[in-house]
Amino acid sequence: MGKLLLWVGLVLVLKHHNGAAHKLVCYFANWAFSRPGPASILPRDLDPFLCTHLVFAFASMNDSQIVAKDARDESIFYPEFNQLKERNEKLKTLLSIGGWNFGTSRFTTMLSTFTNREKFIRSAIGLLRTHGFDGLDLFFLYPGLRGSPRRDRWNFLFLLEELLLAFRREAQLTMRPRLLLSAAVSADPHVIQKAYDVRLLGRLLDFINVLSYDLHGSWEKVTGHNSPLFSLSDDPKSSAYTMNYWRKLGAPPEKLLMGFPTYGRTFRLLKASKNELGAEAVGPASPGKYTKQAGFLAYYEVCSFVQRAKKRWIDHQYVPYAYRGKEWVGYDDDISFSYKAFFIKKEHFGGAMVWTLDLDDVRGTFCGTGPFPLVYMLNDLLLKAEVSSTLSPGFGLSTTVNSSRTCPESLAVTKDLTTDLGILPLGGEAVATETHGRSDNMTVTPGGGLVAPTRPTLSFGKLTVAPEGKTESPGEKAMTPVGHPSVTPGDMSVPPVPIQTGDRITPPRRQAVAPEKMTLPSGKRSD
């Protein structure tokens, strides 16, 4: 009862004032249609007024060019997805490329030379404009890891720099709004250290989607929550910790979007009588009826599970879990989403990212609380309300482990990080039907700077773009970017980019840092 009263007070505090400028970025998975029965979701089933930005996941890549994953995307799903903007003219749509199943090899090949990056950029502009997308989202998991060479960390930054310049130039020539540029990034400090130059990402991207979930799961030997808001004294993994880590490393807080999972992670308990947080587990619980993935339940499957289960609340992490027999699930609900929305507002972050819309109760048929109950709560609290200056009693923002003023400056320094970080796939993507030293163009300066003195001019001599507001049919070659005569910038070129002192892409000279007591999984998830 105390938790419920505190939650009601929190919602009232959040809704005390009207008007707020936050982003609510929501992914839609292009394999959602393949789920059975009422769980099958198409782009036309989405509510165009819930999110400020919708992101279509995922596109693919062929010969260093972005392409639709299959003909169905170009002929049916892209048009349906972008037609949502006809109902809400303020909505922005992005196309995401990558994902866990995509791997890293095609990214590495594309990033390896300026010529390949130029091909990718030209194809991206053509595909985005042809189908009416407003931007590109890069879901590269991860530069310099999972088989990606270390130089990809720097080549990825070169790509972002070149994309941004090309997007600006294309906007000038076509008199259209500039295409947006975003990226999905890890929540793991060890991955962050190896994969990203945080300050440069913050300068080059319009917003940064932090994957602050899958922090615990059935790959571990004890139960833990998928996406706790706050850390425990013996477990620093949490959404708050991750967001403050990115901010302390130099990312602009207004560009950081915290990840909100519309799914739970499950465990099979060793003993049914031992069912608390941290109880011994022996693997994943049974697959869900619709998602059919061991260790994973969509929110609409969680609703069915908890009807016959015992529910508990983790006081210091502000998230629920439930257990039934030997099955245990850590998940989010509207109450935990409310606390997380409160955290975003109090800490002045840019907003929320949802993975994914199609894992929420889209039609309201499973949970009995109306369509999109989780995302609707975020919409209501982030987009329609402004937080007051008074904290609700007992809300743990001031604890040492969660304070934005102590993390991560107090982290221990490690001299070496193992290559096997136990990196894990993001929620639900395993059900996707995917089929799929030193760089030769760089010079290391005496001061440690990394520059590319011979980077050629980025040219778009044959780029063709569809008329504004028009979605073209895919034509015969649906797996390749489509160009249609309309605007042909024959002299569309971007001059070489001088890398200024203080802004150049520079390898770090400091030792890597890692959080104290951070325990990483020993290996990848078995499912």
From Swiss-Prot:
Tissue expression from the record: Oviduct.
Instruction: Look up keyword Signal and say if it applies.
Output: yes
What's one GO MF term for it?
chitin binding
Glycosylation (residues): N62, N402, N441
Which first-to-last residue range defines the signal peptide?
A: 1-21
Query: One GO CC annotation, please?
Result: transport vesicle
Q: Where is the protein localized?
A: Cytoplasmic vesicle, Secretory vesicle
Its main localization is cytoplasm
Q: Give the UniProt keywords, A-Z.
A: Cytoplasmic vesicle, Disulfide bond, Fertilization, Glycoprotein, Signal
Residues at which chitin binds: A71, R72, G98, G99, W100, N101, Y142, L211, S212, Y213, D214, W355
Give each disulfide bond as a residue pair: C26-C51
Q: Record's family?
A: Belongs to the glycosyl hydrolase 18 family.
Protein known as: Oviduct-specific glycoprotein
The organism encoding this protein is Sus scrofa (Pig)
Q: What does UniProt list as this organism's lineage? A: Eukaryota, Metazoa, Chordata, Craniata, Vertebrata
